[in-house]
């Protein structure tokens, strides 16, 4: 199973004092050296952490794939076409939220998402959609004219209040995505404890983890924390 390390909150720390450090690029390089399979960043509309120049620097400099999380806006799609990351992940976004609060509403967005997927594919960019583990939402993937390359299942509800029922919803969602012939990832709120559970779910091929890793890195160092997470996922 692959590990995608989200380095947004390295930029949060930098921006808190308006300094040039800590550098997200350096964090990405350390994470990759420790075993990260790809790097994820979320370029939010308000630029509260990652900035445009961070994204361009990462694309130019890192040795692994770059996954760019963005809202489904024209501004962000144009930036994606200029950066040309390995993949983009379309996420819902509200300015007042502290973090992404849920998955996309595929039911009401399937027409718009179809055109976005086609547009990105024409620029050789893979597309991931961030979706709750809700089969009623996932069924609408079949209405998309062009399939996304990846579905990332939102694990926040499970990670905030774990239960076997919620874990089963994620398992069922991953199985459904696999039957559609789409790669399945998972992310949001994952810790070491949750990662152990996620690795037992068939069909999930990657985890995206950010806030927890950066938080643990304050005490134990980023290299050590990423390495430990990779070992946790391997075991």
UniProtKB/Swiss-Prot annotation:
GO terms for biological process: pyridoxine biosynthetic process. Transmembrane segments: none annotated. Pfam families: PdxJ. InterPro entries: Aldolase_TIM, PyrdxlP_synth_PdxJ, Pyridoxine-5'_phos_synth. The record marks 152 as: Transition state stabilizer. 3-amino-2-oxopropyl phosphate binds at residues 6, 17, 189, 210-211. The active site is at residues 42, 69, 188. Pathway: Cofactor biosynthesis; pyridoxine 5'-phosphate biosynthesis; pyridoxine 5'-phosphate from D-erythrose 4-phosphate: step 5/5. It catalyses: 3-amino-2-oxopropyl phosphate + 1-deoxy-D-xylulose 5-phosphate = pyridoxine 5'-phosphate + phosphate + 2 H2O + H(+). One of its GO terms (cellular component) is cytosol. Its main location: cytoplasm. One of its GO terms (molecular function) is pyridoxine 5'-phosphate synthase activity. Keywords: Cytoplasm, Pyridoxine biosynthesis, Transferase. Homooctamer; tetramer of dimers. Catalyzes the complicated ring closure reaction between the two acyclic compounds 1-deoxy-D-xylulose-5-phosphate (DXP) and 3-amino-2-oxopropyl phosphate (1-amino-acetone-3-phosphate or AAP) to form pyridoxine 5'-phosphate (PNP) and inorganic phosphate. HAMAP family: PdxJ. Belongs to the PNP synthase family. This is Pyridoxine 5'-phosphate synthase. The gene is pdxJ.
């Amino acid at each position: 199973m692959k590990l995608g390390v989200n380095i947004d909150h390295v930029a949060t720390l930098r921006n808190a004092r308006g300094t040039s450090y800590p550098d997200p690029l350096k964090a990405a390089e350390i994470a990759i050296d420790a075993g990260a399979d790809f790097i994820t960043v979320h370029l939010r509309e308000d630029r509260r952490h990652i900035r445009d120049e961070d994204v361009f620097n990462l694309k130019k400099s890192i040795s692994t794939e770059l996954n760019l999380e963005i809202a489904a806006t024209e501004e962000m799609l144009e930036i994606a076409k200029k950066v040309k990351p390995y993949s983009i992940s379309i996420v819902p976004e509200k300015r007042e939220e502290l973090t992404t609060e849920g998955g996309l509403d595929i039911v009401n967005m399937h027409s718009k998402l179809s055109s976005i997927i086609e547009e990105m594919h024409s620029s050789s960019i893979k597309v991931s959609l961030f979706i709750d583990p809700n089969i009623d939402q996932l069924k609408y993937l079949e209405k998309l004219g062009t399939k996304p390359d990846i579905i990332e299942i939102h694990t926040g509800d499970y990670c905030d209040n774990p239960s076997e029922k919620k874990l089963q919803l994620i398992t069922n969602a991953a199985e459904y995505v696999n039957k559609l012939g789409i790669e399945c990832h998972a992310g949001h709120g994952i810790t070491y404890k949750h990662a152990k559970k996620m690795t037992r779910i068939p069909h999930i091929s990657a985890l995206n983890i950010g806030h927890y890793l950066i938080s643990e890195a304050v005490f134990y160092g980023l290299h050590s924390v990423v390495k430990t997470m990779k070992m946790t996922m391997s075991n």
